[in-house]
Amino acid sequence: MKTAISLPDETFDRVSRRASELGMSRSEFFTKAAQRYLHELDAQLLTGQIDRALESIHGTDEAEALAVANAYRVLETMDDEW
């Protein structure tokens, strides 16, 4: 899909240089950057959900250990292509 975006000249120049250094097109660079940012946002959301779950069961060490173990299982199933 083609789209047009506006960005500061300095950012455009930096992206152009770095994409060239990496041997990729600007489109590929922006695609990878957007995917990485979306992955980061998803991870932050998941971290917040884990924190809230821990707060809701705050009390016993056993319950906290179980919640942490479950959180690690969820994180291990996430796709991490970077």
Curated annotation (Swiss-Prot):
The keyword DNA-binding applies. Induction: Strongly induced (about 10-fold) by nitrosative stress. SUPFAM superfamilies: Ribbon-helix-helix (SSF47598). Keywords: DNA-binding, Toxin-antitoxin system. GO terms for molecular function: DNA binding; toxin sequestering activity. InterPro entries: Arc_rbn_hlx_hlx (IPR013321), CopG (IPR002145), Ribbon_hlx_hlx (IPR010985). GO terms for biological process: detoxification; negative regulation of growth; regulation of DNA-templated transcription. Changing residue 25 to A: No DNA-binding. The keyword DNA-binding applies. It comes from the Bacteria. Forms a complex with cognate toxin MazF6 which neutralizes the toxin. Interacts physically with non-cognate toxins VapC27 and VapC40. Antitoxin component of a type II toxin-antitoxin (TA) system. Upon expression in E.coli and in M.smegmatis counteracts the ribonuclease activity of cognate toxin MazF6. This is Antitoxin MazE6. It comes from Mycobacterium tuberculosis (strain ATCC 25618 / H37Rv).
